[in-house]
Amino acid sequence: MALFEHVFMLRQDLSSTDLESAIENHEKTINDLEGSIAYKESWGLKNLSYPIKNNKKAFFEYMNIEIPNERIQEMNSKLNLNENIIRYLSIKVRKFEETPSPMVKEKD
């Protein structure tokens, strides 16, 4: 299993129930692809530096995921088909950080 830090951005106009549903669907996708979520954070609604798909803000979600290397491309393909997710980034890491991300510290 490969380790990834995974961030994805969701549309600003989602209701709280739609937002939760979109996150749960993405978590289910990861689990269906033989992956698991080791840690997750919700960074909340943030301003974007520039509009992305007509969104000036986005909800940011961060996850540490374990998923087989050969399945990460399949996950990315499913993310591309999801109209609620406007951008994502998955970075392969050797080990997960032990401390919360700076974005969570910023909220406090």
Predicted feature descriptions by range:
Residues 2-108:
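Structured, basic alpha/beta domains of bacterial-type, RNA-associated proteins
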